[in-house]
Design a protein with these regions (language model features):
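Acidic, Ser/Thr/Gly/Pro-rich low-complexity segments that form flexible
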Residues: 173-260, 264-493
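Structural recognition of the beta-strand scaffold that forms the well-ordered cores
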Residues: 25-26, 115-120, 157-161, 330-333, ...
């Protein structure tokens, strides 16, 4: 009987032990969860101690509590390890006067994923008043601030430089079906309705990963120089072309490499007009989950790497769904101007074969003379030969011509080759063609004559009046992209950098709130980008 009583007493001590250990463990669990909350304003160790005291337990010592924070409070980890001696009632008779009741708990809270599109104006006016000079260090510090405040692998930044157009480069353009593609430059044209959606339709089937040729076709912007005067034959490879050929101006998409991003910003120069709507469209599109197949393909190809050269396979889910509760999507849009002019070729001179033929004779290698060309006129059924200013039945290079004093007929040099419209615009500026090809063939000697005859119906279309509306359409669409009860609202920060009133009004209306619009000048642009980085980090902490 005494032995049975002793065993019952031991069982009672063990029950008391387990009850006390459970109380300790539950209190420790609740304490670290509360202390690790990133919204918690009370000092971490004070929170833990308070939970124990209110639970009727001794407060842990400072040495029993470990609190760690990220440099920008982007993460917090709290650990507590305690032990309490429980006096025994019956086990003492067997030489066990007390039982240690340990409890340990760890809790961690970390900020989720961040996706940023940095949309920067690099139009010609950015060369004025040292704006581009001031922008570069400011934007690079923003890059550093963001990478310093976000865990490795959780931040991606796309940079979208814009002027008259936005060049997306040969790699990115391959993910879109085009109605008339060429390899001279890489810009897309959009319809007004495209600014009422954040997405673009890629040619990658989201299920199979194969190329989908039935997907929507986009119109590729023509390769042409509409800026140069009629005396300029060769298009400027950078400053004259509507869509630049400078590969250093292509969109840098989905980068997790701060060194790559900063070097890219350093390479900028300024030229061209201003198309805020196109910049914002691409900034929003690069944050839309429709781009996810492109990111997956870039990871598979090994082209998405961090500064150490490691492939960023963790980017595989980007861009995240707008409803994702852990992802924050941000556009930072900077311009020093207002929407001005965008050019598009008229359909008749945008693609397909032109009426212009050229002799491929080596005589004309490097030549800028009209003598190498002939122009077909469908209504006459003849070619105008610029070599001798006559009409005849064969293109220059396919017939013969008469020379005097011998008055003999000689074969034309070379063979005639019909040029596509894109080949024409790669060779000559729009105004040179209008004056020295169209104007000369039809006897239009004055500037007014050849310009009014050819330009209105055939050359370029300007888009000025609707660009502000398109900008506000895409801004509104992006800000309201997540209309669910879940996830985070996409955010837009805008900077008017010494901009005129028209630009200020558009940028202010585009921003997510009045406090997310900044009016900057001179070197204060640096403080503006610092403030935006700080605001983004606060947004990450308050969701």
């Amino acid at each position: 009987f005494i032995m049975m009583l002793g065993l019952a007493g031991v069982a009672l001590d063990l029950m008391r032990y387990e009850e006390r250990r459970t109380v300790l463990q539950n209190t420790a669990d609740r304490a670290v969860l509360a202390a690790a909350d990133l919204n918690q304003t009370i000092p971490c160790k004070d929170v833990v101690k308070d939970y124990f005291v209110k639970g009727g337990l001794p407060a842990p010592s400072d040495s029993q509590i470990n609190c760690q924070n990220g440099a920008f409070d982007e993460w917090r980890e709290v650990t507590v390890a305690v032990s309490e001696d429980l006096p025994t009632w019956f086990m003492n008779m067997y030489g066990i006067p007390k039982l240690a009741t340990p409890a340990a708990a760890t809790a961690e809270e970390r900020i989720g994923q961040v996706e940023i599109s940095l949309v920067l104006d690099v139009s010609g006016s950015m060369d004025s008043n040292s704006r581009l000079i001031n922008l570069k260090p400011a934007a690079k510090k923003f890059i550093d601030d963001m990478f310093d405040s976000v865990e490795e692998g959780k931040l991606s930044i796309s940079i979208v430089p814009f002027n008259t157009q936005v060049s997306i480069g040969p790699d990115l353009i391959d993910y879109f079906n085009l109605d008339a593609d060429h390899d001279f430059s890489y810009c897309l044209e959009f319809d007004p309705n495209d600014f009422k959606t954040t997405s673009l339709t890629t040619n990658i089937d989201p299920v199979t990963g194969n190329v989908d040729l039935a997907a929507r076709k986009y119109k590729q912007n023509g390769h042409f120089d509409a800026f140069a005067g009629s005396s300029t034959y060769t298009p400027s490879p950078d400053f004259g072309l509507n869509c630049t050929q400078d590969r250093g101006r292509d969109i840098l998409a989905f980068s997790g490499n701060r060194d790559q991003l900063k070097a890219y910003i350093d390479s900028f120069d300024a030229y061209g007009y201003t198309s805020i709507d196109l910049g914002m469209k691409w900034g929003a599109a690069l944050l839309d989950p429709a781009m996810a197949p492109i990111v997956d393909d870039m990871i598979a190809a090994g082209t998405l790497k961090d500064s150490s050269g490691k492939v960023l396979s963790e980017f595989g889910d980007r861009p995240y769904q707008f409803s994702n509760q852990e992802a924050l999507k941000v556009v930072v849009l900077m311009s020093d101007g207002a929407n001005t002019t965008e050019y598009e070729l008229q359909p008749d001179v945008d693609s397909g074969l032109s009426p212009l033929w050229r002799s491929n004779s080596t005589t004309y290698n490097g030549s800028t003379s009209a003598a190498q060309y002939s122009l077909w006129d469908q209504s006459r059924g003849q070619y105008y030969i610029f070599y001798n200013n006559t009409w005849r039945n064969e293109a220059w290079g396919d017939g013969t011509y008469k020379t005097c004093g011998t008055c003999a007929f000689k074969p034309d040099p070379g063979d005639a080759v019909q040029l596509s419209w894109q080949e024409v615009w790669d060779r000559m500026t729009v105004n040179w063609y209008a004056r020295y090809i169209h104007g000369r063939a039809y006897g239009l000697a004055t500037t007014n004559a050849w310009s009014s005859s050819w330009s209105p119906s055939n050359s370029v279309v300007k888009h000025e009046t609707n660009k502000d509306a398109q900008t506000l359409d895409i801004c509104t669409t992006f800000k309201s992209a997540n209309n669910t009860l879940y996830g985070r609202r996409p955010q837009i920060y805008t900077i008017a950098f010494e901009a005129p009133n028209a630009g200020i009004n558009v940028l202010r209306s585009c921003a997510s709130s009045t406090t997310q619009f900044y009016n900057a000048s001179g070197s204060t642009i640096g403080g503006t980008f610092t403030a935006i980085a700080s605001s983004i980090n606060k947004l990450r902490l308050t969701y």
